[in-house]
């Protein structure tokens, strides 16, 4: 599976409270969550994000509270994947469980700029920066995790098994 998209770049320690602020946790409606995604760190995000776009961030993306709402808000906003130097472990697992592809690749994060166009191949872990004509090697998903992503998350995977 591969995707193409434009980059929204963020720094270190982007926590779940800025991905989807706690004041919106009274809903599980995906569209409602998407309409508030990243608003405490990037007020223009929801107006500028397009289906297929990609979030790139430094270390410890998704730290903070263990809330499934954070990856749901990101995915529902149209983001096709998140690339970071490192992820908080619970965010990593929640993302896989809801079918949001994520990759760790420090080299890519260091070289990618906001607005760059990327192509990401999850089967190989190759990230192509189409804006700079560069390639970076991230960690490919193990086969079982790729199957979960391909089935739009853990529930879809179990249904189709």
Curated annotation (Swiss-Prot):
Record-listed E.C. numbers: 4.2.1.33
Example GO molecular function: 3-isopropylmalate dehydratase activity
Function summary: Catalyzes the isomerization between 2-isopropylmalate and 3-isopropylmalate, via the formation of 2-isopropylmaleate.
Family: Belongs to the LeuD family. LeuD type 2 subfamily.
Associated pathway: Amino-acid biosynthesis; L-leucine biosynthesis; L-leucine from 3-methyl-2-oxobutanoate: step 2/4
Protein name: 3-isopropylmalate dehydratase small subunit
Catalytic activities: (2R,3S)-3-isopropylmalate = (2S)-2-isopropylmalate
S-S pairs: none
Alphabetic keyword roster: Amino-acid biosynthesis, Branched-chain amino acid biosynthesis, Leucine biosynthesis, Lyase
Gene (name only): leuD
